[in-house]
């Protein structure tokens, strides 16, 4: 199995776990502001940065057609702006998943990250990106468990 095959498998596995968390999130939790960042915001943040860092460099990033700049971080929403629905976030996750194979296949794993603030090569960027997915997926799984013992199954690898 090649390194790129392993990377693609781990992207798909981590995003499959994120998808489970999103799908299992009760509607009452989706917009819940008892946490600093509502569930939907953490899920969207995770997906946009996964998508972003799959690109060769910042200038090559093509945002999702529904992208809203203010949603990618954790700053307050612009007045009157509605959050993304669960269906919209899942739509974006699928777009990201659909691009994993082509984006990873095109990588020069020995090349620079492509992002000046990340001083390592493309191979390490893939680990960094997958760890980011799992950090926030774990955060969302913890919320689900605390809310009502809702469990997300472990996905070790995905074809």
Predicted regions, residues:
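Acidic/histidine-rich alpha-helical segments that form the ligand environment
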Residues: 74-114, 124-134
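Short secondary-structure junctions
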Residues: 22-26, 107
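Basic/polar N-terminal segments that are highly enriched at the extreme N-terminus
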Residues: 1-5
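Amphipathic alpha-helical packing segments from all-alpha helical-bundle domains
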Residues: 16-20, 96
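Short, contiguous alpha-helical
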Residues: 8-12, 19, 27-74, 115-159
